[in-house]
């Protein structure tokens, strides 16, 4: 069984003490690739270092996280834009609008988001969207920038069926399913009944949002298996089939190398 973790902060300081061991464990568990979303200019060196250490396993994104947007965001955006000229990236992310913690910089978040959406169009890259308490604002920016030309994933999706119905109109978008699907009384388990399996990818968002039975602990890429099992149950299919479909979806969206071809015997 092969899996792809489409969203992990494996470069973060929370993994400094045992990163190599966790990567080895992930590979042994069948995780063939991980995608690394950027946060701000300060996280760029760590992402690059991990991708250089694991060039056939870790694939970088580049973007400015909405909670890193403040009154000086334009200077931060210049650093992100410069980074995009320096090497290959597989998505613009993670980007979006987050009004959960603070609405002070809502205007700046929206401007940064729309600029980065345009970058994705210019560079022909997918986007990894962070959206929290900002569904309508996020969708407004997507339609304003070019909904018919954009592609990407709504990372850490936990929305309602009504929200999915709106997202479903964006035919080149997927939703990223993480550990919250394993939580008791979550809305997502019901929403999944309405989402075609061809429109989902799996993620951990590690070190955050660990799935049951690890909830409350540091999340790690290997725990994606627990999420895969739960999602497979929701679709009433074997987890191996779920893994194959979501891995194919991830490969199509992010255009990362398909490691499974190296597993085939000639």
Segments and roles (model prediction):
Residues 1-266:
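Mid-domain alpha/beta scaffold segments of enzyme catalytic cores
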């Amino acid at each position: 069984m092969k899996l792809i973790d489409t969203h992990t902060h494996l470069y973060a300081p929370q993994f400094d003490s045992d990163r190599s061991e966790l990567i080895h464990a992930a590979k042994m568990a069948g995780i063939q690739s991980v995608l690394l979303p950027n946060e701000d200019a300060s996280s760029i060196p760590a992402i690059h270092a991990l991708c250089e250490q694991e060039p056939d396993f870790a694939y970088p994104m580049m973007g400015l996280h909405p909670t890193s947007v403040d009154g000086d965001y334009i200077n931060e955006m210049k650093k992100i834009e410069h980074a995009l000229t320096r090497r290959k990236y597989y998505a613009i992310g993670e980007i979006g609008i987050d009004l959960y913690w603070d609405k002070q910089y809502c205007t700046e978040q929206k401007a940064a988001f729309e600029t980065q959406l345009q970058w994705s169009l210019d560079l022909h890259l997918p986007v990894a969207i962070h959206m929290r308490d900002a569904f309508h604002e996020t969708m407004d920016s997507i339609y304003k920038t070019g909904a018919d030309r954009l592609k990407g994933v709504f990372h850490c999706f936990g929305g309602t069926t009504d929200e999915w119905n709106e997202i479903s109109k964006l035919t080149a978008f997927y939703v990223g399913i993480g550990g919250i699907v394993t939580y008791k009384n979550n809305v997502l388990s019901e929403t999944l009944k309405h989402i075609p399996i061809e429109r989902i990818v799996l993620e951990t968002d590690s070190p955050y949002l660990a799935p049951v039975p690890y909830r409350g602990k540091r999340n790690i890429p290997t725990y994606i298996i627990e999420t895969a099992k739960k999602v497979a149950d929701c679709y009433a299919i074997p987890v191996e089939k779920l893994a194959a479909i979501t891995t194919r979806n991830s490969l199509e969206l992010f255009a990362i190398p398909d490691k499974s071809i190296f597993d085939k015997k000639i």
